[in-house]
Amino acid sequence: MAKEFSRTRRIAQQLQQELAQVLQRDMKDPRIGFVTVNDVDVSRDLSYAKVFVTFFEEDKAVVQEKLNALISAAPYIRTLVAGRMKLRVMPELRFVYDSSLVEGMRMSNLVSQVINQDKAKQQQFGSADEVLNEDEGATDDTDDTKGKD
């Protein structure tokens, strides 16, 4: 069983590399544009391959158009990749949009915005360390006067 999993993983990795090369070099369809193959998940019997792709577009309508173009070109892409790989049966390609990259960029932008807001507040009101040090200095002065009485 472990050997079978290892083989499917190796095939998935090779398929990902070959798909990336085919989509970058051999595909001349302007509807697809620049596409990144993030991952490939191959079924255990090697009959299907789910291909996770991303586009550098944020508009959902444009992304859907590009995904539809990939889906319609899947049989042609499959024949191009089959010529490069030595498999008895080439898996049927199913393209799926992977939004994890877009979500990661969105989260990174949110974190950057919060950091910038914190820096602006720190410059406006002073840092929390300065406020704490001033408070400690004030308590030390009052403690000294109590000890002298």
Swiss-Prot record:
It comes from Shewanella sp. (strain W3-18-1). GO terms for biological process: maturation of SSU-rRNA. Keywords: Cytoplasm, Ribosome biogenesis. The gene is rbfA. Monomer. Binds 30S ribosomal subunits, but not 50S ribosomal subunits or 70S ribosomes. This is Ribosome-binding factor A. One of its GO terms (molecular function) is ribosomal small subunit binding. Its main location: cytoplasm. GO terms for cellular component: cytosol.
